[in-house]
Amino acid sequence: MIKNAYINILEISSVSLSTGSASTSYPLYRLYDRDIGRLFKAGSSATLEILINQGTAGTVVDRMLIPSGHNLSGMALSLQNSTNGSTFATVYSCTQADTALINATFATDIKQYWRLVITSPATAPQIPELFLTRDYTWESDPHLYGVGSLDNIFNVENDVAAGGQDRFLVFGNPKKQRNYKVVGADSTQETNILTFNNAWAGSKPFWLFDHSSEWIYGKLVSPLNLKIDDMNIYSFDFKFLEVLP
């Protein structure tokens, strides 16, 4: 099933460091600015505790996503939560194996306090974005055959010389696109997809779990074009393009 992860509780919480410090050139807010090309970096290689306080029990969380571009390979990570801010329980822990996307799932939970602990790192940790989020699983999947473009989009400038020769200049990496068409959606999916659309609001890139089970960070490139096809039956377009660091 297709999924979206579009909330990040850090954006609606007080975020601080209960242990460790931030580099003045790589501030803490970069953990939740939705710009995966700009890094948060710790001020030293000491143990780091990133504390998130929602103010109340707050929003349901069941997934942590940290995009590639971090340097957490070999570091001990522990995600914890708490109702009172003093006694924490661990919901996920690992020694990170590489610098690829960190995708951690755990039992759905609502807690006021969350913290990510990086214990005794060998170097100062750096993180492009920290998402504490919840999956929205589509009630019905899109039709994939004959309606959607799934090829990569390349950023290439093609100039033609006076003699007719083609010259190509490649800028950066290609972007993934996923163009889906959903038909036969019920009123629950209509409500949920509109809630998603209002939350992303044309300016907050989000995560898509696509038909091939890949998590991609990106944006919608056109409106949903939600339509009523029959009583309580809806259709919409989902034209998605990857956002690169």
State what each model feature region is.
Residues 1-48, 53, 59-74, 91, ...:
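Extracellular/virion structural assembly segments
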